[in-house]
C-alpha cells in the first residue's frame, strides 16, 4: 500500500472525491445537500465522449461538427453549471427541499446519460488529429516526473489549486461570509440584507461545475465514458465533507477539513480494496464512518448549546 504507485493511485481518487467535496462543502454550509453530483459526472462523461467520438450531427444540414477539447471542456462545464442553477432555483425560489430536488435531478441525469448512448460505453476515447479534437488525455497527464518517479497526477494538482482558491473565497470574501451566515441563520441573514436566493443558486452552480470537471477528469483517466460512471460518488463527497468537520446543519465548515476528509475516504477506499475487503463490506464501513462523523458533530453542537 505504501509504494509510490499505490500512493499516486490514492491521490487520483482523492482528487475525485475532493473536487466534488469542494462544491459539496459550499452546499452543505448553506444547510443544503446535492445528491446529483454523481449523475452529473456520468452525464458529462457521456456528452464529452460522444462529442469526441461521434461529433454533433446536424441532420437538417447534413453535416457533423467536431469540437476542440477546450471547446468540449467549456461546453461540459456550462452544462454542469446549468444543472446546478436549476437545482438552486428550485430550492431557493420554489422553496423545495434540497434532498428532494437533487434526488430528482440525480435520476434525471442518470437517465439522460443512458439515453445518450443507449446504455453503451464510449471506449478508447482519444480523438483524431485531423478533426482537431485530440488532447482529452491531458486531464490524466502527470507533472514533475523525475528519474524513476512517474510524476504527480494533474488531477491532484488541480484539486489542491481549487482547494486553495475555495478556502480563500470561503474565509476572505463576502460570498464566503454570506453562505456561512445563511447556513447559520437564514432568517437573520435575510434581514441583514444578504441575497439568500442568489447565494444559494450560486453554491449549487459551483457544485455542478465541480461535478462536470470530475466527469471530464474521470473520462480521461479511463479513456472511456460509461453512463453509470459516478454512481454513489455523492456519498464519497458527502463523507469527505462531514469527516472534515462541516456541519450537516449548516453554518460551519472549512475547505481544509474537506481536503483532509477526502484523503481519509481515499485511504479507506483504496486500503480496503488492496486488503481484499469486498465492495459490499466497504459500503457498510463507509456508512458507519458517515454516521459516526455526524454523531460527533451533533455531540459537539449539543455541548456548545449548554
Q: What label would you give each PLM region?
A:
Residues 28-33, 82-127, 131, 169-174, ...:
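Short loop segments and helix-boundary regions at transmembrane helix junctions
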Residues 68-72, 76, 83-87, 91, ...:
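Helix-loop-helix "hairpin" substructures at the membrane interface of multi-pass membrane proteins
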Residues 13, 98, 151-159, 200, ...:
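Loop-to-transmembrane alpha-helix initiation sites
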Residues 191-198, 268, 272-306:
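Cytosolic-side transmembrane-helix boundaries in multi-pass membrane proteins
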Residues 70, 99-173, 199-202, 222-230, ...:
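Transmembrane helix-bundle core of multi-pass membrane transporters
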Amino acid at each position: 500500500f505504501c509504494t509510490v504507485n499505490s500512493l499516486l493511485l490514492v491521490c487520483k481518487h482523492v482528487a475525485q472525491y475532493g473536487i466534488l467535496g469542494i462544491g459539496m462543502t459550499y452546499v452543505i454550509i448553506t444547510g443544503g445537500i446535492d445528491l446529483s453530483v454523481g449523475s452529473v459526472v456520468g452525464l458529462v462523461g457521456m456528452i464529452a465522449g460522444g462529442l469526441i467520438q461521434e461529433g454533433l450531427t446536424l441532420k437538417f444540414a447534413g453535416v457533423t461538427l467536431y469540437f476542440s477539447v477546450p471547446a468540449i471542456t467549456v461546453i461540459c462545464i456550462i452544462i454542469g453549471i446549468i444543472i446546478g442553477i436549476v437545482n438552486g432555483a428550485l430550492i431557493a425560489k420554489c422553496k423545495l427541499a434540497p434532498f428532494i430536488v437533487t434526488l430528482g435531478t440525480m435520476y434525471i441525469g442518470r437517465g439522460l446519460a443512458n439515453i445518450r448512448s443507449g446504455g453503451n460505453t464510449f471506449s478508447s476515447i482519444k480523438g483524431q488529429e485531423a478533426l482537431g479534437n485530440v488532447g482529452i488525455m491531458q486531464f490524466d497527464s502527470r507533472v514533475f516526473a523525475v528519474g524513476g518517479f512517474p510524476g504527480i497526477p494533474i488531477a491532484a494538482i488541480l484539486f489542491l489549486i481549487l482547494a486553495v482558491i475555495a478556502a480563500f473565497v470561503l474565509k476572505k470574501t463576502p460570498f464566503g461570509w454570506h453562505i456561512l451566515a445563511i447556513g447559520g441563520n437564514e432568517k437573520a441573514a435575510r434581514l441583514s440584507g444578504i441575497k439568500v436566493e442568489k447565494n444559494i443558486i450560486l453554491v449549487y452552480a459551483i457544485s455542478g461545475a465541480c461535478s462536470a470537471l470530475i466527469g471530464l477528469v474521470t473520462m480521461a483517466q479511463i479513456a472511456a465514458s460509461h453512463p453509470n460512471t459516478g454512481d454513489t460518488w455523492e456519498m464519497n463527497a458527502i463523507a469527505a465533507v462531514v469527516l472534515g468537520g462541516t456541519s450537516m446543519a449548516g453554518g460551519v465548515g472549512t475547505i481544509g477539513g474537506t481536503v483532509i476528509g477526502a484523503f481519509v475516504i481515499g485511504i479507506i477506499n483504496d486500503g480496503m480494496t488492496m486488503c481484499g475487503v469486498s465492495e459490499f463490506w466497504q459500503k457498510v464501513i463507509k456508512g458507519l464512518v458517515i454516521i459516526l462523523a455526524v454523531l460527533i458533530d451533533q455531540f459537539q453542537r449539543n455541548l456548545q448549546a449548554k
